[in-house]
């Protein structure tokens, strides 16, 4: 009996050990590969766990965000805004100031300039400056692609096709015409006559070292147009020296601007006054500044301007002298900074014209006209009537 009982206990122990071995083989072995690959979780640090979580989340598919119609419109319009340089308004300011000078000079003594005309010319400057940039980029598409500063422009980089740019230019010119027809017929004809300069300017850098001269002739057309728009005709005694002063001013600031690209211009064969003047740039710019100040003084004398005007001319001269004296023609960032500061030149002169006109009275004009009349009358001596002979 004892032997039989012992045999049963041995059999039960053997069965339990066999079952445990089988269970271990069945349930524990599949976990081994994962344990081998991952390791003991208790030994992992926090950064390692975060790395695994980030990898697993990155594999999950995220839904693509859909743009709203307004966002799509903004994305589509962005290259065109860059084409017309909306993000760089300095060109619009430099185009507007000669117009504003002329409008302010044409105002009657003691009166403010015509605000409606200033608004129209400001709108026209924004539109036509953009049109000029579009024309420039159409001509210079291949050149811009080779210049570091301009290679990302919409046409040069292929964001806009040439056909799309031409369609956009047509819209710009149509808007410019819409502004122009708000003026009198003399101004419409005078304004339309400047379009030839706007179109041909980009070509000048291929044939002459003086493209800045042509740019000055186009950019300062408003010095003639502003007076014509308010008075119905152009007073050449005042407008011509003002126009020539603006041309000299443009040569100054655009030569500074051109020094940014002179190395690229040399490689691709583009001409500019920056290359023409070279190391003598400051001497040339000083000469054009002197000519500008002389023209402004002549325009002020023709308009019977007062002390604030001539004070503003003096401040403008000091500003330009400081620009030229401190200019580093081999530092593109300094050239860009000096170029942008010319917006202050235009504003200072405009404020001087406005203040000078407000302080101007009719007395000086009447005295001058009376002196001219007196001198003319004194130079004319009528012949005394002769007594007729009496025949006997």
Swiss-Prot record:
EC number: 2.5.1.39
Cofactor(s) required for function per UniProt: Mg(2+)
GO cellular component terms, A-Z: mitochondrial inner membrane
Transit peptide limits: 1-22
Localization per record: Mitochondrion inner membrane
Pfam families named in the record: UbiA (PF01040)
Topology term for the membrane: Multi-pass membrane protein
Membrane-spanning segments: 90-110, 115-135, 163-183, 184-204, 207-227, 236-256, 283-303, 307-327, 339-359
Ranges of Polar residues composition bias in the record: 369-379
GO molecular function: 4-hydroxybenzoate polyprenyltransferase activity
Pathway(s) it belongs to: Cofactor biosynthesis; ubiquinone biosynthesis
GO biological process: defense response to fungus; defense response to Gram-negative bacterium; defense response to Gram-positive bacterium; determination of adult lifespan; isoprenoid biosynthetic process; ubiquinone biosynthetic process
Family statement: Belongs to the UbiA prenyltransferase family.
Name of the protein in its database record: 4-hydroxybenzoate polyprenyltransferase, mitochondrial
Biological classification of the source: Eukaryota, Metazoa, Ecdysozoa, Arthropoda, Hexapoda
Protein's gene: Coq2
